[in-house]
Swiss-Prot record:
It is a peripheral membrane protein. The gene is ATG18G. The PI(3,5)P2 regulatory complex regulates both the synthesis and turnover of phosphatidylinositol 3,5-bisphosphate (PtdIns(3,5)P2). Required for autophagy. This is Autophagy-related protein 18g. Induction: By sucrose and nitrogen starvation. It comes from the Eukaryota.
C-alpha cells in the first residue's frame, strides 16, 4: 500500500507543477496590466519626490560614532561623507540636534572618530588637538605639510613622495587626514600609495586597512608602530540598493586586540597549526540533519526548474522570490540565485592562499603576540566587529547569509618559560550563528547594544536585521505576560554568555555547540520611502507624513525628547537610531510582540497571524517614534561649531595634574553636560595631604542691592565636601554605600572685608576743599550755581542685613543710586568708626544755622529714620539724598554705631564741626578716605570737590 501510494504521489507531483505553470501563465498576462499601472503610478510619485531630492548633496558614506570630550563624557554623533565634503551631527539629545561641522571639499569615502588616546609618560602628542575626526579622501595639494607617507612595502617615506597621480585622488582615496574639532583645521596627514579601504580606532592605536596590509600607528603620537599582511580585501563589483558605503571591512579593533583576515595559517613553535574543521550548521534548526537538508534542497531546486516556463513571464523578481524558499535549506557557501561572485571581486590570491579564505587572526596590541587564529567561514571575510567589551567578535563572509559570533578567550601556553604565546586552538569559542537571509548581500554596518545583548546587521539592500543574543535560543525574552513587562536577561557580575564549560580550568573539554539564531525583527527599505503600501494609503488619506524607511547605519541609542519620553512605552526593550537612504535619522523603539487573548475565539493574535510572523519575523516590533531630515543641501553654508574651551582645556589640565600626583594625592573630576552643548559645570577638588592642604579654594562674589535673609550656604557653620568616585570592586554592580565613599572638604579662604572706593576724577585738595560742596539753585528762569560750604555732614552706617533707603530727596534734583555689595557673615566687624553723630534725644539731628559767604541762610536737611521720600529746603537749595539704614532709633540717641555693622561714607554729607575735636575728625577721615577727591563738572563753569565712598564691600578670596 505504501509503495502504491508513493508511486501515485510521484506521478502527481509533475502534473501538479504543469497545472501550476499554466495557471501562472494566465495570471502573468493579467499581472502585466497591473504592473504597468503600478509602474506609471510609481513614476508619477518618483517625479514628485525627485524635485525635493535634487538639491541634496550626494552621500558617499554614513555612520555613527562617539565623540569623547572627557574620560566619562561622550556624545553620539552622525558622520556623513559627501562627494563634496563631510558633515558631523550631534545626535545625543533629540531636542538639540546640532550640526557641529559642515565642510565642503573633495569626495570623502570614510569617516571615523578617534577616541581620547591613552597617555604615557610626558608625551603630549596631539592631545591638545582632540577631539579628532579621521577623514579618508583623495590626496590634495592644499593639505597641511605635517604628515607621513607610506610606501607599498611598509617603509615610512617622506611627506610628498607619494606616486599617486592627481587624477587618482577621486577614484582611489589614499590620504587619511586628522581634522581637529577644536581648532577646525587639519593637524596631521597620512598618505599611502594604495587605496585606503577602512579605518578603526581605539585609545591605543589607529589602524588603517589597505587592500593587502594593515598599518597601526600610535594613537597619541601618530607614529608608525607595526604592520601586518592580510588576506586581500574583497572589493564590491557594484554598490547595493542604497548606494552608500562599500562594505564594513574585514578588520576590527578592540580595547586590547586587533582582528583581521589572515592571509595564511601561522605556525607554532611546537609544529604546524592544524585549523579546526569548520562545519556549517543547517539553517533550519540545530536538530536537523545536514544530509537530509541537502537532499531536500537539491530536490526543491530540481522541482523549481519545472516552473521556469511559468515564472519567466513574471520576471527576475518572481524567480528570486521562489528560489528564496529553496535556498533556505542550503548550507553556507552553496550556490544561490545571486552568487557572491557577482557582488565581490577578490584579486591577488594564489592557489595556496585561496585555501585560507575565511581565516581570522587576533593580535595583541600591547605585546604583539598572536592571541588566536581560526577559520570562521569557508568564503573570504568581508566584515569583522568587536562588541564594546572587546571579547565578542562578529564575522561575516562575502556571502552574507550567515553571521558568526565568537568569544575570544586567550589561553597561555607553557612550552617555554618566559615566552609569551597562546594556545590558538582553544582561545576562541563559537557561540552563535545568526541567519540573515538566503540571498547574498554586502554587510555594510554592524552595531552592538551597550550590554552586548542586541546586535544589528545592515545589508547593502537597506535592511536592518536585528538579533538578540540569547544563549537559550528561545523567545522567552520577548513574550510578556498580560499586565507584566517582558522578561529580560538578568544582570550578573560575570558576562551573560559565561558558563562553567568556558572556565579556564575546564578548557580541555569540548566547547559548546553554537546556537542558531534567526532575525527577531527587520527595518526594511522601500524604494519610495514608505514602510508598506497599506500604511501609505492610510497616511495619504489622513494627510499624515510618511515615515522614511530602510537603514544605512545604526546605533543603539535612546535620543528622545522629554515630551515623547513621557509618552514612551514602559515595556520598550531597546531603542535604535537609524540613518536611512533618504537622508533622515529615525528613532525606533523595540517592543515585544502583542499577545492579547480574544474572548470570542480564545486565540492569541500571534497564533492567528502565524504566516505573517513567519514572513516578517515580528517577534519584536520596531516602531518609529520621530525622525529628522539631516541630509545637507547644496545651498547650506559651511559650519564650524567650536567646542567649549572650558571642556577641552580643563580636561587637559586635569589629566596633566593627575599624571604628576602621587598615589596619595588624587584628583576627582566631575564634568556634567546638559542638553545645551555650550554649557558645562566643572568642579575640581584635591584631597588633603597631612599636614599640608592643597591650595584649592572655593570663592564667591555677590552683588546685592536689597536686603534679605542670608542664604544657607553663607552661614559660617556650612561647609562643602566633595566625594571621590568609588573605585572599589564592590561598586561594579552600580550600587554602593555612600557612607564608605571618602569625602574631602573644600577650604573657604576669607580675608577682611574692605570698602570699595569710587574714584572717578580724583584730585588733591586741602581739608577745607574736601568739605566744600556745590549746591544747585532751581528757579523759573533756569539754574545757576552758588558756591558755599555745607556746615553739616551726616555719617551713614550700614548693616549687612539692613537695606539702604533714601530718606530725603528733591523734586527737581536727580537722585543717586547706590549699590550695596555683600559677602559672608564675617564681614560685619571689618570696619568700625568712632566719629560722633551728634544726635538729639528725640532722634533728630541738630539743625545748625550759619551764614555762608554769599549771605544766604542755609538750613541743613533733617534726617529722620522714616519712610520719607523727599525733603525740601525753604531757601530754595537742594542737596543729594541721604541714605540711611533701617536700624532702630536707639543708635541715633546713643551716638554709637551698633557692634557688628560695617559702614561706608559719603563725604558730601559729612559734617565739619568747628569744635575741639576737629583735629581728631581730620585724622580719622584721612585714615578712612585715603585722601580721595571727587570732581564733578557742571556746564563746565565750576567744580564740585569732595570725597565719595561708594557703599559696598568685597571679599578677596583665594590666592
Amino acid at each position: 500500500m505504501m509503495k502504491k501510494g508513493k508511486g501515485k504521489n510521484s506521478g502527481l507531483l509533475p502534473n501538479s507543477f504543469k497545472i501550476i505553470s499554466s495557471c501562472l501563465k494566465t495570471v502573468s498576462a493579467n499581472a502585466t496590466n497591473v504592473a504597468s499601472s503600478v509602474r506609471s503610478a510609481g513614476a508619477s510619485v518618483a517625479a514628485s519626490i525627485s524635485a525635493a531630492e535634487d538639491d541634496k548633496d550626494q552621500v558617499t558614506w554614513a555612520g555613527f560614532g562617539i565623540l569623547e570630550l572627557g574620560q566619562h563624557v561622550t556624545r553620539h554623533v552622525l558622520l556623513l561623507g559627501y562627494q563634496n565634503g563631510f558633515q558631523v551631527f550631534d545626535v545625543e539629545d533629540a531636542s538639540n540636534f546640532n550640526e557641529l561641522v559642515s565642510k565642503r571639499g573633495g569626495p570623502v569615502s570614510f569617516l571615523q572618530m578617534q577616541p581620547l588616546p591613552a597617555r604615557s609618560g610626558d608625551h603630549e602628542g596631539f592631545w591638545n588637538s582632540h577631539p579628532l575626526l579621521l577623514v579618508v579622501a583623495g590626496d590634495e595639494t592644499n593639505g597641511t605639510g605635517l604628515g607621513h607617507s607610506f610606501s607599498q612595502n611598509g617603509s615610512l617615506a617622506r611627506d610628498g613622495s607619494s606616486d599617486s597621480k592627481a587624477g587618482d585622488a577621486i577614484n582611489y582615496p589614499t590620504t587619511v587626514r586628522f581634522y581637529s574639532l577644536r581648532s577646525h583645521s587639519y593637524v596631521y596627514v597620512l598618505r599611502f600609495r594604495s587605496s585606503v579601504c577602512m579605518i578603526r580606532c581605539s585609545s591605543r592605536v589607529v589602524a588603517v586597512g589597505l587592500a593587502n596590509q594593515i598599518y597601526c600607528v600610535d594613537a597619541l603620537t601618530l607614529e608608525n608602530k607595526f604592520s601586518v599582511l592580510t588576506y586581500p580585501v574583497p572589493q564590491p563589483v557594484r554598490q547595493g540598493t542604497t548606494r552608500v558605503n562599500v562594505g564594513y571591512g574585514p578588520m576590527a579593533v578592540g580595547p586590547r586586540w586587533l582582528a583581521y583576515a589572515s592571509k595564511s595559517s601561522m605556525t607554532m613553535k611546537t609544529g604546524r597549526l592544524s585549523p579546526q574543521t569548520f562545519t556549517s550548521s543547517p539553517s533550519l534548526s540545530p536538530s536537523s540533519s545536514s544530509g537530509g537538508s541537502s537532499f531536500m534542497a537539491r530536490y526543491a531546486m530540481e522541482s523549481s526548474k519545472q516552473l521556469a516556463n511559468g515564472l519567466i513571464n513574471l520576471g527576475d523578481m518572481g524567480y528570486k522570490t521562489l528560489s528564496k524558499y529553496c535556498q533556505d535549506m542550503l548550507p553556507d557557501g552553496s550556490t544561490s540565485p545571486a552568487s557572491p561572485n557577482a557582488i565581490w571581486k577578490v584579486g591577488g590570491v594564489s592557489g595556496s592562499d585561496a585555501e585560507n579564505a575565511g581565516m581570522v587572526a587576533v593580535k595583541d596590541l600591547v605585546s604583539g603576540a598572536l592571541v588566536s587564529q581560526f577559520k570562521a567561514h569557508t568564503s573570504p571575510i568581508s566584515a569583522l566587529c568587536f562588541d564594546p567589551s572587546g571579547t565578542l567578535l562578529v564575522t561575516a563572509s562575502v556571502c552574507g547569509n550567515n553571521i558568526n559570533v565568537f568569544q575570544i578567550m586567550p589561553s597561555r601556553s607553557h612550552n617555554a618559560p618566559g615566552d609569551l604565546s597562546y594556545e590558538w586552538e582553544s582561545s576562541h569559542v563559537h557561540l552563535f550563528k545568526l541567519h540573515r537571509g538566503i540571498t547574498s548581500a554586502i554587510v555594510q554596518d554592524i552595531c552592538f547594544s551597550q550590554q552586548s545583548q542586541w546586535v544589528a546587521i545592515i545589508s547593502s539592500k537597506g535592511t536592518c536585521h536585528i538579533f538578540v543574543l540569547n544563549s537559550s535560543g528561545s523567545d522567552a525574552a520577548f513574550q510578556p505576560c498580560e499586565g507584566e513587562e517582558p522578561t529580560r536577561l538578568p544582570a550578573s557580575s560575570l558576562p551573560w554568555w559565561f558558563t562553567q564549560s568556558l572556565s579556564s580550568n575546564q578548557q580541555s573539554l569540548s566547547p559548546p555547540t553554537a546556537v542558531a539564531l534567526s532575525v527577531v525583527s527587520r527595518i526594511k527599505y522601500s524604494s519610495f520611502g514608505w514602510l508598506n503600501t497599506v500604511s501609505n494609503a492610510t497616511t495619504a488619506a489622513t494627510g499624515k507624513v510618511f515615515v522614511p524607511s530602510g537603514a544605512v547605519a545604526a546605533v543603539f541609542h535612546k535620543s528622545v525628547t522629554h515630551d515623547l519620553q513621557l509618552n514612551s512605552r514602559t515595556n520598550a526593550l531597546e531603542h535604535i537610531l537609524v540613518y536611512t537612504p533618504s537622508g533622515h535619522v529615525v528613532q525606533h523603539e523595540l517592543l515585544p510582540s502583542v499577545c492579547t487573548e480574544s474572548p470570542e475565539n480564545g486565540l492569541r493574535v500571534q497564533k492567528t497571524s502565524h504566516v505573517q510572523v513567519q514572513e516578517d519575523d515580528l517577534r519584536v516590533k520596531v516602531e518609529p517614534i520621530q525622525w529628522w531630515d539631516v541630509c545637507r543641501r547644496s545651498d547650506w553654508l559651511e559650519t564650524e561649531e567650536r567646542l567649549p574651551k572650558s571642556i577641552t582645556e580643563k580636561q587637559y589640565d586635569l589629566e596633566t595634574v593627575s599624571n604628576h600626583l602621587t598615589s596619595h594625592e588624587d584628583a576627582c573630576l566631575s564634568l556634567d553636560m546638559n542638553s545645551h552643548f555650550s554649557e558645562d559645570k566643572y568642579l575640581k577638588s584635591c584631597s588633603e595631604k597631612p599636614p599640608e592642604r592643597s591650595h584649592c579654594y572655593l570663592s564667591n562674589f555677590e552683588v546685592k542691592v536689597t536686603s534679605g535673609m542670608l542664604p544657607v550656604w553663607q552661614n559660617s557653620k556650612i561647609s562643602f565636601h566633595v566625594m571621590d568616585s568609588p573605585r572599589d570592586s564592590s561598586s561594579t554592580g552600580g550600587e554602593f554605600e555612600i557612607e564608605k565613599v571618602p569625602a574631602h572638604e573644600l577650604e573657604i579662604k576669607q580675608k577682611k572685608l574692605l570698602p570699595v572706593f569710587d574714584h572717578f576724577h580724583s584730585t588733591k585738595a586741602t581739608l577745607e576743599d574736601r568739605f566744600s560742596m556745590k549746591c544747585y539753585h532751581t528757579s523759573a528762569t533756569g539754574s545757576h550755581q552758588v558756591n558755599g560750604k555745607i556746615c553739616q555732614d551726616i555719617i551713614n552706617c550700614h548693616s549687612k542685613p539692613g537695606s539702604i533707603e533714601s530718606a530725603e530727596s528733591s523734586e527737581e534734583g536727580s537722585t543717586k543710586q547706590m549699590e550695596n555689595l555683600h559677602d559672608s557673615d564675617h564681614m560685619s566687624n571689618s570696619i568700625k568708626s568712632s566719629l560722633p553723630l551728634y544726635p538729639t534725644v528725640n532722634g533728630i539731628y541738630k539743625e545748625i544755622e550759619k551764614n555762608n559767604a554769599n549771605g544766604w541762610m542755609e538750613k541743613p536737611v533733617t534726617a529722620k529714620l522714616s519712610t520719607l521720600k523727599e525733603t525740601r529746603i525753604t531757601n530754595g537749595f537742594t542737596t543729594p539724598p541721604i541714605l540711611t539704614d533701617s536700624v532702630n532709633e536707639q543708635m541715633l540717641s546713643t551716638g554709637k554705631p551698633p557692634m557688628g555693622f560695617g559702614f561706608a561714607l559719603h563725604e558730601e554729607h559729612c559734617k565739619a564741626v568747628a569744635d575741639p575735636k576737629e583735629e581728631h575728625l581730620k585724622k580719622k577721615l584721612d585714615e578712612v578716605t585715603n585722601v580721595h577727591h571727587l570732581n564733578v563738572n557742571n556746564n563746565n563753569t565750576e567744580k564740585l570737590q569732595g570725597d565719595k565712598m561708594v557703599h559696598g564691600m568685597v571679599s578677596f578670596v583665594g590666592d
